[in-house]
Amino acid sequence: MLIYYSLGNFQSLQRKEATLLGGMAKVTIKKDFKGARIVDFDMETLVTDYRLGGVRVTDYFDIITTYPWSKYSRAIAESGNIGNGNANFNLDYMFQLQAEQAAQVHEARRKAGLE
């Protein structure tokens, strides 16, 4: 059994630490005469990046981008607004959180015999 869950929107303006990193499920299902089964799964970490544009029309950031972790760099992070105003969410915390997330996926893949 494989379970991915989401308790919110793909992108949000929430300031809670747990909402600033997310993931996109990658699941391979094989279907044949025996039935359907999961033959592979993984997850790509996603980062929500907040920027201020030229004109402020709300109290929120007006440029919000979701990056795959593989395309998110320290330079991008340092030039943006890490944590959307949450002082507890800094660059080091983000890397720690991503490492924990990756370890959970790795352990699930190991238990499934995929690593």
State what each model feature region is:
Residues 20-115:
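A short C-terminal boundary segment appended to hydrolase-like catalytic domains
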Residues 1-25:
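Conserved beta-sheet core of the metallophosphoesterase superfamily
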